[in-house]
Amino acid sequence: AWAQFQDAQSVYTASLAMLLVLYGVAAALNLFIQGSGKVYAPMPWNFMSICQGFWQDFKSLWTDPLGSISLSVTTLFWGVGATLQLLVLSWAQEKLLLNLSQAAYLQAATAVGVIAGAALAARWVALHQATWVLGLGLAMGALLPIMLWVTQWQTAVLLTTLLGLVGGFFVVPMNALLQHRGVVLLSAGRSIAIQNVNENASILAMMAAYSGLLYFHAKVEDLILVLALLMITVMARVLWRHLLLRTPSA
């Protein structure tokens, strides 16, 4: 038993070390990003002034037509994505009869799909075309219920990879558009602060809702359908608003 514990500890230590190395590499790569040349006025260090400034920035980004669309999408995506990571584990164990380690490979398949989708979006979608991918949000929501009919792990790998691919291709242009509007309206750092608050609030809210549904013994099938319905409903509203903004008034 002690030997097994030591082996497990070695695996955890190695995993943590690998994560630290990756974070270090990411931090080092930031050193090679060229500065924009812009010089911003110093920010006040008074707490109330900081809060008031943050609230003004928050409203500026949410009231901007393109800013609100891209912020809505990225906020939704990260909340759904975090919930989906846990849901995939439960689904794989209950419906595919995989153990936890095997189920984690489906999370890896999703990550591979996201990376591939992000790379394709960076190659094929220009900034002025960013809103063209909004329909993929509906597609992602429509793909989720397919999980209910999957019974083989091979099919599950293909489906989770496809979900990641669609998600990566969908969110990267939206994130680029959000960063662009943030720089135009505010500054890079201030817009990222607004984005992080919204996305983390979305993750917390959806994790709380997911935990609450589990507490009341909701079935995996019901959780999948709720997540799909949320994705489709929000994206339909975002698309409708975007179409209204594009349609010239009479």
Would you name each region that the model predicts?
Residues 3-17, 59-116, 155, 169:
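A single, central transmembrane helix in multi-pass transporters
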Residues 71-72, 104, 134, 189-193:
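Conserved glycine-rich helix-kink/hinge and helix-boundary motifs of the Major Facilitator Superfamily
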Residues 1-3, 69, 77-85, 110, ...:
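Substrate-agnostic recognition of the 12-TM MFS/MFS-like secondary transporter fold
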Residues 35-72:
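Juxtamembrane intracellular "pre-TM" segments in multi-pass secondary transporters
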Residues 138-152:
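C-terminal ends and interior cores of transmembrane alpha-helices
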Residues 3, 116-130, 214:
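Helix-to-loop junctions at the C-terminal end of transmembrane segments
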Residues 1-19, 90, 94-96, 204-227:
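Transmembrane alpha-helix termini and helix-breaking/packing motifs in multi-pass membrane transporters
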Residues 12, 16-46, 239-249:
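Helix-loop junctions on the cytosolic side of multi-pass membrane transporters
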